[in-house]
UniProtKB/Swiss-Prot annotation:
Its EC number is 2.7.1.202. The keyword Hydrolase does not apply. The gene is fruA. It is found in: Cell inner membrane. This is PTS system fructose-specific EIIB'BC component.
């Protein structure tokens, strides 16, 4: 397979750089070529090219107009393309590179799959499965090439698994790396050396993560795991896990139920009015949509949340007790709070049972299919029925009544709080805490916090985009060039689009973003806007009845964006040599 060198000099456009790298890699694979890609941005260098590779390079593709340090390539032939050209047609970029590359140029690089290299497989995943999933995959792939190892990465994103690992690749691997912020299924890796980490180490320092994995990985699940009986990985201690990660796993699996149920209910109301679910309309399309959304989709929300919290803690044996406990919580009107408690009781309870119940080897197979599900379900079911169910139901009823009765200053304060949290760390723990709280309340038919959270999450990238267009002297050329991409991400409710700007000047940028998002959230809550879907950004506004008080909701977004832009103008200093 022919191999080529690519340097993406992105400046502030780090998000577009990662997308361009992935597009080039896929296009090169389709064309029967391999590419070694280095990404250079204001956040650092990802996948730095080793000296022996740069010294022997004959042809190099330079993407972008920032500094690519081309002096290190000596007399190599350089082909320059813009980021936009590569994103628009990566196949054409690969073809242009191939046309300038002599047949002998393949000797300039050494394929990481050579006989002397380690074989590594990895899985990357994050709670929402959008940004960090693919950035972590990119970091691992670049790091493996730098170290001379063969790397295959399976991404478990929002649309499911991509580039799935084969059984042959897993068998041949020297180590398995799980770079994920939520739990993933490890059943395939029984008997393999396995190392678990979050996505951030893979993004920030892939080579160090790979070296640590090779040195510290432990054998997962024994040589032949029995249907998840030994579900708790010995490698689990390699990375810090905790309640937050388990909760985010549950939320991640719950979101599709919330989205499907909420939008189908909104469509039912659009077709048949607010009484579409009444028996008087039985047999109509609107009534059917309401039954599917409310009686099926929403009914499974809390069991899915609880089941996958338990799965994150205890692996497969925890799913059945968790889901049953979640359904018990829902039937007791304990809602998402009860589901969270049921999930943790089931997860930690099953994990403890699995650890302390010892059976003869020939009876070990009974644990995952009989003993753990029955005892785990008994534990969580009785705990919810007699201990936690009613108190949590009373607490949720009070919280629901309080939220529904919010007016004036109370709604304003909650909107300010949720909005500020959404912008504080843009996809981090504080952001996810506000998002999980708002999403969970949908199960109790409380939709105003969800509306506030989404409008606040859209505000930072859109506010930055507006500021780069209006207050040009506060931003570099590279920052202004990536503003369109940030704006598109904002429209899609991907708050992470603002991260490159915040990383460059956090002390001035983050306060401006928090102010704008807090204002947007406060206006949304005060206006009583409701949102029945947990995601979708500006595009969900096109669905009838998905958002109430639509004009006020759009006003909240516009005001929040403008406030963000003005705050950036006031807080950021002019950039030298930039004309407004």
């Amino acid at each position: 397979m022919s191999s080529s060198i690519v340097v993406i000099a992105a400046g502030e456009r780090s998000t577009e750089a990662v997308l361009a790298a992935e597009a080039l890699r896929r296009a090169a694979t389709a064309a029967g070529r391999s590419v070694t890609i280095e990404i250079r941005s204001d956040q650092g260098v990802l996948g730095a090219l080793p000296t022996e590779l740069t010294n022997g390079a004959a042809h190099v593709l330079i993407v972008g107009d920032a500094d690519a340090d081309t002096a290190r390539f000596g007399d190599a032939q350089l082909l320059h393309l813009s980021l936009g050209a590569v994103l628009d047609d990566p196949a054409a970029a690969v073809s242009q590179l191939a046309a300038t590359t002599a047949p002998a140029s393949t000797s300039a690089t050494t394929d990481a799959s050579g006989a002397g290299g380690k074989r590594i497989v990895a899985i990357t995943s994050c709670p929402t499965g959008i940004a960090h999933t693919f950035m972590a995959a990119e970091g691992l792939q670049q790091a493996a090439k730098k170290l001379g190892y063969q790397m295959r990465v399976e991404t478990q994103g929002s649309v499911g698994a991509q580039d799935a690992l084969t059984d042959e690749e897993i068998r041949a691997a020297d180590v398995v790396i799980i770079a994920a912020d939520r739990e993933v299924d490890l059943a395939r890796f029984g008997g393999k050396r396995l190392f678990k980490s979050g996505t951030k180490p893979a993004i920030n320092d892939g080579p160090a993560l790979i070296q640590k994995a090779l040195a510290e990985a432990g054998v997962h699940g024994g040589a032949a795991p029995v249907a998840g009986a030994n579900a708790t990985s010995d490698a689990k201690g390699n990375a810090r896990t905790g309640a937050y990660k388990h909760l985010m796993t549950g939320v991640s699996f719950m979101l599709p139920f919330v989205t499907a149920g909420g939008l189908l209910i909104a469509l039912a109301f659009a077709l048949g009015g607010i009484y579409a679910g009444d028996d008087a309309h039985q047999g109509t399309l609107a009534w059917s949509l309401f039954q599917i959304g409310a009686k099926a989709g929403f009914t499974l929300m809390v069991p899915a949340l609880a089941g996958y919290i338990a799965y994150s803690i205890a692996d497969r044996p925890g799913i059945a007790p968790g889901m049953i406990g979640g359904l018990v919580a829902a039937n007791l009107n304990a809602g998402f709070l009860g589901g969270i408690i049921a999930g943790f009781i089931a997860g930690y309870g099953v994990a403890a049972l699995n650890r302390y119940i010892k059976l003869p080897r020939n009876l070990e197979g009974l644990k995952p299919v009989l003993i753990l599900p029955v005892l785990g379900t008994l534990l969580v079911g009785l705990a919810m029925m007699y201990v936690f169910g009613q108190p949590v139901a009373d607490l949720l009823a009070w919280l629901t009544a309080w939220l529904r009765g919010m007016q004036g200053s109370s709604a304003l304060l909650l909107g300010l709080l949720l909005g500020g949290m959404m912008a504080f760390d843009m996809g981090g723990p504080v952001n996810k805490a506000a998002y999980a709280f708002s999403t969970g309340l949908i199960a109790s038919q409380v939709y105003t916090p969800m509306a506030a959270a989404m409008v606040a999450g859209m505000t930072p990238p859109l506010g930055i985009a507006l500021a780069t267009w209006v207050f040009r002297n506060r931003f570099t050329v590279e920052e202004r060039g990536s503003a369109t991409a940030a704006g598109v991400l904002g429209l899609a409710f991907v708050t992470e689009g603002a991260i490159p700007y915040a990383a460059r000047d956090p002390l001035r940028t983050i306060p401006a973003l928090v102010i704008g998002s807090a204002v947007a959230g406060a206006i949304s809550m005060t206006a009583g806007a409701e949102l029945k879907a947990p995601h979708g950004g500006i595009f969900v506004l096109l669905i009838p009845n998905a958002v109430t008080h639509l004009l006020n909701y759009v006003l909240a977004l516009v005001v929040g964006v403008v406030v963000t832009a003005v705050a950036l103008r006031l807080l950021k200093k002019p950039v030298a040599d930039v004309i407004a």
